[in-house]
């Protein structure tokens, strides 16, 4: 690996937005660690991208379940065996469990599970990979959030656990940005994207959804931090 090659780790990257983000980062010249809790799917995704680029050294699979602390620690230990530096962490993995619930009918199990993955998971991964990020000349953390987490637009009652978890993730972003002044730490809304989560009627392709994430990871000014973005513009939350 060239010394100046940037290194990224993308969680939830075996399909959907995370897979496309990984693809676009390879195109930008990154070495990518592709995270997935499903080992078979993750390895297949990494092989697919390496075949696309005819380069077996571009994408590496890293097994991780961000809802499990032990899995996060194992992933960090495995990463350390392959690299001592990380330039960009993209906390993309997330779940949607309550799109058929409202705030009056959601259950403790759904609510706690959603927050554990979408909010706490992103924080714990950031903490675990912080030693590697500190070795970068320009470390970045990108948290994939959602317009559903915007309080400024008012709640419409849809998927309360999911939306609240994304509001809280934006809060984590602000806290991390304050604690890590030499880092660029941002949240981003990819828009309504045609994925398993977004559904077939969504208005954006995965390539369009990934674009803003990749921009924050690769090209946005390092001085931009603690903000919430969509389409390369800061939005309120």
Please report, for each region that a protein language model flagged, where it lies by residue.
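Canonical Rossmann dinucleotide-binding motif of NAD(H)/NADP(H)-dependent dehydrogenases/reductases
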Residues: 2-33
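Conserved glycine-rich Rossmann-like NAD(P)H-binding loop of the short-chain dehydrogenase/reductase
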Residues: 28-44
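A glycine-rich helix->loop->beta "capping" turn
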Residues: 55-58, 78-91, 97-99
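Hydrophobic positions on the long internal alpha-helix
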Residues: 90, 125-129, 133, 172-173, ...
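C-terminal helical subdomain
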Residues: 167, 182-183, 187-193, 199-237
């Amino acid at each position: 690996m060239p010394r100046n090659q940037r290194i990224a780790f993308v969680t939830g990257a075996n399909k959907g937005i995370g897979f496309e983000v990984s693809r676009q980062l390879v195109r930008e010249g990154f070495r990518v660690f592709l995270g997935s809790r499903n080992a078979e799917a993750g390895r297949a995704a990494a092989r697919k991208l390496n075949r696309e680029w005819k380069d077996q050294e571009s994408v590496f699979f890293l097994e991780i379940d961000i809802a499990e602390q032990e899995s996060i620690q194992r992933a960090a230990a495995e990463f350390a065996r392959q690299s001592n530096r990380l330039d960009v962490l993209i906390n993309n993995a997330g779940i949607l469990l309550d799109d058929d619930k409202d705030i009056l009918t959601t259950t403790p199990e759904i609510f706690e599970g959603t927050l554990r993955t979408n909010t706490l998971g992103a924080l714990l991964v950031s903490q675990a990979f912080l030693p590697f990020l500190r070795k970068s000349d320009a470390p970045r953390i990108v948290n994939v959030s959602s317009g559903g987490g915007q309080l400024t637009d008012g709640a419409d009652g849809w998927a309360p656990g999911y939306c609240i978890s994304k509001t809280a993730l934006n809060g984590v972003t602000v806290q991390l940005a304050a604690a890590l002044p030499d880092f660029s730490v941002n949240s981003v809304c990819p828009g309504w994207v045609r994925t398993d989560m977004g559904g077939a009627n969504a208005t954006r392709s995965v390539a369009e959804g990934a674009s803003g994430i990749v921009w924050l990871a690769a090209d946005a000014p390092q001085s931009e931090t603690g903000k919430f973005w969509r389409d390369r513009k800061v939005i309120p939350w």
